[in-house]
Amino acid sequence: MNYHNITTDDMRNGDGLRTVLWVAGCNHHCKGCQNPVTWNPHDGLIFDVEAEQELYNKVNKSYISGVTFSGGDPLYPENRDTIFHLAKYIKKYIPGKTVWLYTGYLWEEIRDLPGMKWIDILVDELSDVTYHWAGSTNQRVIDVQKSLKTGTVILKGE
């Protein structure tokens, strides 16, 4: 997997202060995408052992609420194994941190992926460029664990 950046102290991509991993690779190519530079899965940097440790160190800071996977699309097929490995590690070894994931796939397309059990919040659906201020009107913020338990989409806060 390749990535473009690991940012810390982000307040726009989930609850609290977060570390965000911006991955390379996206096959949705949304009109008006804010990150078209991330579409090519071979651009950016190779996500190696050093990058993995950097991510864990940043997430492990006491004031960080958790990690957000964005991009590109973290669920681009070539990214899935690595993303789910990272999510599993964080949930198991860095307690108290939440895992958010932004994707262009619909929940209904990806809910059965084995690694979804490591994701707390999923923001699904393609970007809608007609909604400029707070994201996209068509995106859902899904509580993954509650949705997996009930078999129906449960939005965060319900």
PLM regions: where:
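Auxiliary Fe-S-binding modules of radical SAM enzymes
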Residues: 2, 6-15, 60-62, 92-158
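Canonical Radical SAM [4Fe-4S] cluster-binding loop centered on the CxxxCxxC motif
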Residues: 14-49
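A cross-domain feature marking catalytic cores of carbohydrate-active enzymes
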Residues: 23, 71, 101-103
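Canonical radical SAM enzyme core domain
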Residues: 40-54, 76-116
